[in-house]
């Protein structure tokens, strides 16, 4: 299947600028005339929903303060410092905070300026599934995918705060889009681009970004048009290498800076960003040993200390199991998405059972993503 470049009709030479702007609303020649206007309308409605009342939005004060400090000093910006003096970092990688800090540097410290990046990220995320799904099943299905994502409650909620999940979702959806393009052509550059997107997502949410890797790799190995399995495995290995390099680039750079010239790394007893990411924000989240050792504690940690125990799924009565997302407080928040994903995957399999090629990768991709997320949710004591 050949991918046709998406180019809108070029305006006539010498046309006024306002007419050139209007061409952005016109669909490319290979799509129905209603496709792009409908997509932009969906994204606009989503942006309004995400940004409504953002001047009085509820934000995380700890990370809001860090973004403000980072906006006032390039030194603090580089290292993700929590305080203006640059003595201690935040307890996570600062990828999402970089975007927020730039917004605050441009517009000044306002709640709406802190939330604005998440609104933009959420609106941009709506555009990407359309392109990925359209390649496989056409523009109508792409619009349905964009609309479903736009009205998903958790998507709206994430776009109305200052948590890092909005950037994580945008980058992972871009990775899935690049992978879908690679599936159709066997393009190594597209697969490497997917690795770059996942690596950047790691800067926003650390190991959670890697949960998508098994699904993306399995989809390419099973459905890419490369003639030999050895070739596909080599492509996946190269993409994995790119992911690792991009993921670990900032951590390595910080580790090379002498400790006296940078802030102390919060979340680590040994001033190591690797300990912060892979222990405090990794293994420690599974074992319950994840109390910050340097920076100011979050309200959740204060409550944990006062009660004498951490607020984990296990201590709240939610036992580890493969169906944990379908029970308790998780069911109302996100559990309903899993049956919908499985039903959608089965529907694709039934509808496309006679069609060979990349469109049949939808089932392993969906199931792989669901399996990765379920394995995380089934951990013995992962925190809420």
Regions found by a protein language model. Give the residues of each.
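Membrane-integral, polyisoprenol-dependent glycosyltransferases
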Residues: 1-299, 303-384
């Amino acid at each position: 299947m050949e991918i046709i470049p998406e180019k809108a009709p070029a305006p006539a030479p010498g046309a006024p600028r306002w007419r050139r702007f209007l061409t952005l609303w016109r669909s490319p020649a290979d799509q129905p005339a209603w496709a792009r206007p409908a997509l932009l309308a969906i994204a606009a409605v989503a942006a309004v929903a995400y940004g409504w009342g953002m001047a009085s939005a509820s934000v995380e004060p700890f990370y809001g303060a860090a973004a403000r400090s980072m906006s006032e000093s390039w030194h603090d910006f580089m290292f993700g410092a929590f305080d203006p003096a640059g003595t201690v970092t935040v307890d996570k990688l600062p990828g999402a905070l970089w975007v927020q800090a730039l917004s605050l540097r441009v517009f000044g410290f306002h709640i709406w300026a802190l939330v604005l990046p998440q609104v933009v990220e959420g609106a941009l995320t709506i555009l990407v599934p359309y392109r990925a799904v359209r390649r496989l099943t056409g523009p109508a299905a792409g619009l349905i995918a964009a609309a479903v994502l736009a009205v998903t409650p958790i998507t709206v909620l994430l776009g109305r705060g200052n948590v890092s999940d909005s950037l994580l979702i945008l980058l992972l959806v871009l990775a899935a889009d690049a992978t879908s393009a690679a599936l159709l052509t066997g393009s190594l550059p597209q697969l490497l681009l997917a690795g770059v997107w996942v690596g950047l997502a790691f800067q926003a949410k650390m190991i959670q970004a890697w949960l998508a890797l098994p699904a993306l790799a399995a989809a390419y190995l099973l459905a890419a048009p490369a003639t030999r399995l050895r070739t596909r495995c080599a492509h996946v290995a190269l993409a994995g290498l790119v992911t690792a390099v991009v993921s670990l680039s900032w951590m390595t750079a910080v580790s090379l800076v002498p400790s006296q010239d940078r802030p102390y790394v919060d979340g680590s007893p040994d001033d190591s960003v690797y300990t912060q990411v892979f222990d405090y924000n990794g293994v420690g989240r599974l074992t319950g040993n994840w109390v910050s050792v340097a920076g100011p504690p979050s309200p959740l940690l204060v409550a944990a200390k006062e009660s004498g125990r951490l607020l984990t799924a296990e201590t709240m009565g939610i036992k580890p199991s493969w169906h944990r997302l379908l029970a308790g407080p998780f069911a109302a928040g996100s559990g309903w998405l899993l049956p919908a994903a499985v039903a959608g995957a089965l529907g694709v399999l039934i509808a496309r059972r006679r069609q060979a090629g990349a469109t049949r990768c939808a089932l392993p991709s969906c199931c792989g993503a669901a399996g990765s997320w379920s394995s995380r949710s089934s951990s013995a004591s992962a925190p809420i």
